[in-house]
Amino acid sequence: MIVLDSSFLIGFYNERDAHHAAASTLMDRFLAGTWGKGLLLEYIFLEITTVLMLRRDLSVATRVGRILLDAEELEFVPCSDLFSQTIETFSNQAGTRLSFADAAIASVARSRADGQILSFDEEFKKLASLRINPDST
């Protein structure tokens, strides 16, 4: 399993994004089963659809949201049960500036995905327990 971050998914779905080419390569590997099933946190779904609506339009955001929710390669992870753990991770971070959603990603990656995350967020690289875009070189 691997946790998917909004920077990866937005990079893939927004052809104008600076990370589009790299995200497309990673997506090919993900869809080929390199890391197994992807974990899509509720918080990340909210980020993706909001950003795509603002940067593109509502129809793009809605279409991508539906693709993500219907994808057999993804497991949707509701975040209500993760809230207390995420508060701890967020509040006790040192040497990083993880957003609340990123703190949830870090927690889930550690507990369910052997620390693996698909992301272009440099803050994750500061955490030794995480592996960002594993074997992507």
Give the ranges of each region predicted by the language model.
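Acidic, PIN/NYN-like endoribonuclease modules and their adjacent C-terminal/linker elements
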Residues: 1, 106-107, 111-137
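Metal-dependent nucleic-acid phosphoesterase active-site entry motif
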Residues: 1-18
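PIN/NYN-family metal-dependent endoribonuclease catalytic core
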Residues: 3-4, 26-55, 77-78
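Acidic active-site catalytic centers that drive phospho-/nucleotidyl reactions
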Residues: 5, 47, 102, 121
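A generic structural signal for short hydrophobic patches within well-formed alpha-helices
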Residues: 9, 45, 124-125
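Short acidic, glycine/proline-enriched helix-loop-strand junctions
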Residues: 62, 67-81, 93-95, 124-137
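Active-site neighborhoods of divalent-metal-dependent phosphate/nucleic-acid chemistry enzymes
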Residues: 75-116
